[in-house]
Regions:
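Beta-sheet entry/capping signal
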Residues: 33-35, 132-134, 172
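Detector for Asparagine
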Residues: 40, 115-118, 156, 167, ...
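Conserved catalytic scaffold of divalent metal-dependent phosphoesterases
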Residues: 48-158
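Core catalytic region of metal-dependent phosphoesterases/phosphodiesterases
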Residues: 1-75, 165-168
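Charged helix-capping and loop-helix junction motifs
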Residues: 15-21, 151-160
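Contiguous mid-protein beta-loop-alpha structural module that forms a pocket-lining wall or clamp
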Residues: 135, 164-174
């Protein structure tokens, strides 16, 4: 599971794309299931433009799945692996505001955070209790302490509640 930001920005140099591609293809050729979550550095600010890891989805690379929208994956979606994965890729502020019609980004994020909590609860109710559940998200966690590199980020992150990621039904959070 790769939880987003394959590159430092949304327009990677061809050399970086080549080297990243070589590594993903090695995983594919070894038949190692790989989930690539789209992160904020992978996305263009313009709605409708391709993201930086789009080629793996477009080319339908075997054993590689690109996750660009919230999804609950079951074994049949995961090459019959005995696991369930809840995927939360980055949700852009502009895309979110366009989708909700909100003009206040704080209110838009608050609404989405509530909806994500409700969606995860719904997925947990639908889950198979005999299989492990992984939550993977490209988001900040309420109350988390970040390293020094985090200080350069702007304050527009989607924030998941600590209670959500500490849910006892989740076996792993990435």
């Amino acid at each position: 599971i790769f939880a987003g930001d394959a590159y430092k920005d949304r327009s990677p140099a061809p050399t970086f794309q080549r080297e990243w591609g070589k590594r993903i293809i090695r995983l594919s050729q070894a038949k190692i299931p790989t989930l690539l979550l789209v992160g904020n550095h992978d996305l263009s600010p313009a709605i409708g433009r391709a993201h930086a890891i789009q080629e793996f989805d477009t080319l339908q690379v075997p054993f590689v799945r690109v996750l660009q929208k919230p999804d609950f994956l079951h074994p049949e979606d995961l090459w019959d692996l005995p696991v369930q994965v809840m995927a939360m890729p980055w949700i852009s502020r502009s895309g979110l505001m366009a989708a909700t019609g909100e003009t206040d980004s704080t209110e838009a994020f608050t609404r989405v955070e509530e909806n994500i909590g409700n969606l995860v609860e719904k997925w947990l109710e639908e889950s198979d209790p005999s299989l492990p559940i992984i939550l993977t998200a490209h988001a900040s966690i309420e109350g988390a302490k970040f390293g020094g590199e985090r200080l350069v980020m702007l304050g527009n992150d989607l924030v998941l509640s600590a209670g959500l990621v500490k849910n006892k039904k989740l076996n792993y959070v990435a």
